[in-house]
Amino acid sequence: MTAQRKKISLIGAGNIGGTLAHMIALRELGDVILLDVSDGIPQGKALDITESSPIDRSNVNITGTNRYEDIKNSDAIIITAGIARKPGMSRDDLLQTNAAVMKEVGENIKKHSPNAFVIVVTNPLDAMVSVVYKSSSLPTNMIVGMAGVLDSARFRYFLASELNISVEDVSAFVLGGHGDTMVPLINYASIAGIPLTQIIEMGVITRGKVDEIVERTRNGGKEIVDLLKSGSAYYAPASSAISMLESYLKDKRRILPCAAYLNGEYGVKDLFIGVPTIIGKNGVEKVLEVKMNDSEQEMFYKSVSAVKELCQLN
């Protein structure tokens, strides 16, 4: 007997939503509901992707819709709805507009798919996860924000590029909010198992250059927004969300930095912020508390304060 395919709903059919739908189809992770308020956009993108299925050898169903009823009984939901950044805008500038959208999305998740695992991508990320959480009444382990995976990927790529080595050999991660106060942890970065701090001591790269990479990581999203001049990044954000989705659907129990709910971990309560988590079949199965030096702790708590302030503005 053939196992029933998972149902994955994508709320928002913009650049990230469309890219997600195609990536899910290529990996055959499940059937897709592509939902958007714009009539014709999700239907057109769904048809375009499914017309590529004979070439891609993908046997999943992709349905475009404008009706929230169609997300009923989803196994997983990825939210990308809302307006994107434009040059000169910060992620925080999106707050009021996107908060209203997230409230509506959360209420419909509560109504139609209260048992789904939910990944929020919409910016300003940490605040938007909180809005969806409150309006959906989801358990804290079943909702996360996609930020740390993306920020960590940028950090890893910039290091690999500067060192002229394979990205596969670079391990690094970023804590804190998805914004200017994020904390790329140099002390936990390594190259093929060799701590980055030792690579610096060897003279392969200078600490000054690493600090430049840290700053470039913090401004990674802005760099792309400025280059595109209309819209924001979507390939890397989509890939990041897929890694989280796949870890949940396949119970991979990968350690991934996500905006997760803290209930005392790191001395923080009742806040979603980027920390290392284990994602498996039960959603966020564990929050890992890593030790930080005084400087890193100071930066992390500065990030916590920035996220709290943003959440209070909403």
UniProtKB/Swiss-Prot annotation:
GO molecular function term, any single one: L-lactate dehydrogenase activity
Catalytic activity: (S)-malate + NAD(+) = oxaloacetate + NADH + H(+)
Family annotation (Pfam families): Ldh_1_C, Ldh_1_N
Binding site for substrate: 85, 91, 123, 154
BP terms from Gene Ontology: lactate metabolic process; tricarboxylic acid cycle
EC number(s) from the headed UniProt entry: 1.1.1.37
Function text: Catalyzes the reversible oxidation of malate to oxaloacetate.
Name of protein: Malate dehydrogenase
Species of the source: Wolbachia pipientis subsp. Culex pipiens (strain wPip)
